[in-house]
Amino acid sequence: MSDAKAWAAADDAHRLIAKALAGLVAEDPTIPPHPYLSRHLADHAARGNVLDDAHVPLAVLPWESSKNVRTLLRQAGAGQHQDWLEAWAVIEPFVRDADPDSRLTSLHLAHHAATRRRTPLAGLPAARRGLAGSRITPLWSDWTVPGNVLAVSDILVESLAHTTTSDGRNLLISGDSHGTIRMWETHGVPFGVPLHTYGGAIQHLLPLQADLFVSGGTDGAVRVWDTLRGRLLAEPVRRPRTWVSGLTLHTPADAPQCILVAHSDGRLTALDTATFQPVDTPLPDLDAAPAILTGIGLAETDGMALAIAQGRQVCVWRPGQDVVRTEQHQDEVRAVVDLPVPGRYATCDDSGHIGFWDAATGRRTAAATPSPAGSVIALAALLVDGEQAVVSAGIDHTLRVWNADTGHPIGGALEGHTAPPLALTELPGDSQALVVSAGADKTLRRWKLAGHGSRPARVVRRPVTAAALPSWAIAAPSLLIAVADEAGTALWNAETGRHVRLPAGESTVTAFAWATVCGDPLLLTAHSDAGIRIWSLDAGNGGAPGSRGKLVNHSIPVQAMEAFTDGERTLLATGSGDGSVRLWDLGRQRQLARWDDHMLSVRDIAVLDTEDGALVVSAGADGTVRLWDPATGPSGRPPIHCGQQGVHTVATVPPRHGEAALIASGGEDGTVRLWDAATLRAAGDRFDAGDGPVTALVSFRTPAGRPCLAAAGPSGTIHVWDVTARTHLLRIVTGNPLSTLAIRRTSEPDAEHPVLLAAGTAGVCVFGVHLERY
């Protein structure tokens, strides 16, 4: 190792080392490998051009700690037999401090989703379904995820910039909503320690020469930082009760370069780039409103102009000349960016308009056609395949690329973010055009733009709007999966892989429920037109379900519903955005009751079985959980004020063997709280997911009868807790926001492992859960 000259080529040594180290990895992934293996095996394999599943075995991945497998895969390019490595790269940014069992389980699910999409159970031998140490058995999936996640942030990133240090290192800089600045290697690994301002959000970052950069935030302060040393050098400006609305460099034709700072009251301040002291230089008078700034490069001897946006108006100013105003935008301008062509710049606004302008005349030279849907939040200028281009970030979660000369789109939309991108920057140091975006989904994503206009758009899975599994009580011959997205609704048979489409029309399905009426299995679908449709399942011949009627009374779409038996009747409880809980007799297809006690929308519905009959439990956006008696209406019990900054979801834990019946609520604050159904008091400490709101929640029992809860939300992680022991059992990381959890509970006594469905922006997956090892 110390004398690389002894080898014919440097990669020969790494290839042999990787081969030798791979032989030291135990076949059982539950056995911890030597720390050197987990830290360096993937790197040796990459350097030796043998980065594949044989040289980096599956068993070492749950222990992998180099945190750069996804980067190594990008550098090494496509290889042979990298299925497990690629599956690990998808979830690697999200696993963080998960325990090895959770990592292995997450890897197992990710691998199945990537390699067995829509594969029927009959097509997968039982021997290949299991994996030693995994807590699940994947059964069926329709899951598509982008692989361009560069990094994941705990906090919302609101600003991005890039810089090249004096030693040639290319770095990304991000500023977040909590006032923290982080630096990243261009492959996503953090560089240095976070820098804390202990002030407002960092919304502007401006790299300078000599390894410095400037930040501006909502606390009204401008700060100067040393990039390599990671320390604060100066705070030349602080204006309380204002915020920094713009930062740019400005070089007049006959004066030294300076830093221009704009505050929310329209005041401009010029700072010397060496001393950071205020300098006396001519500046335009602005309205008392937030100003967005960018310096516009002119011809070599003409210095720079300044483009300034305030509200819907943009103007161009040069020292010694009058302000040149452009035509007024339709809506508030969100970003102004300088183009590499002298005297040219681009703007975008909340109407979705993107304009390209000439600074000398104030006239528009081109406009983006067609305009993207919704507001455009940020812009970045760069060369794409030799053409001057602008990348836009839209409220519709996409990035788009535009020719800066014609305004015409280059290629299709770039999809992958699950929330709007908030900031953009070009990524330096690569021969290809690259852009990094920071989204409200708390991910930094890397986009390769070379050849974008000539290659077909990547197929992106539409987010699932509803999904469900039938319970054991539904007379179905095999595992059925109901899935809906914007493209339509389908009923899949996981055993055969076949599916049928529901002729549900153009309205999107917002919720599912399963029921049995007079022995006939039914599927109920709630729609965006506020109606509920009833379908009879033709399980015998695999044909499309037939329509059995429609329930209409809600004024806003139903968000949750649950069917249950009450004596000889089959009832349906529904909760809607109109704030009401309604009760229906499915046999007669008529409404029995309407309860309007929730002040805001009803987000979830559950049913609690008690000795005295079933109770309907509803979770409201007003932060309460309420109980309803199907026979009498309100159960006579007061609402539960959950104190969770809003309740998104609710589940029930029926009593067994002398246990108390419990109600679980999932909140905006990221907690799950348990409530005694009899006393309506808190039952023990809350469970803390620790990674964002809990928006989906189910309860189930293991074959041994242990009550468990599974919770998920926008973080994309499924948390599993033991209710009795109050312990966290498992984290199943998917890397994409989840909106739905459903459970197929087994009959009494529990003789099988429960089956869990998870669905969200990337699709749907179904798996058996095995927790008895704990």
Language model region names:
Residues 160, 205, 247, 293-296, ...:
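Hydrophobic core register within WD40 beta-propeller blades
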Residues 6-148:
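Hydrophobic repeat-domain scaffold segments
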Residues 438, 442-452, 733, 738-774:
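Blade-level signature of beta-propeller repeat domains, shared across WD40, Kelch, NHL, RCC1
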Residues 178-181, 219-221, 265-266, 312-314, ...:
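Short coil/turn segments within WD40 beta-propeller repeats
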Residues 186-189, 227-230, 273-276, 318-321, ...:
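Short loop/turn segments that connect beta-strands within beta-propeller blades
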Residues 150-158, 195-202, 237-244, 283-292, ...:
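WD40/WD-repeat beta-propeller blade N-cap
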Residues 172-176, 213-217, 260-263, 306-310, ...:
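Conserved beta-strand element within WD40/beta-propeller blades
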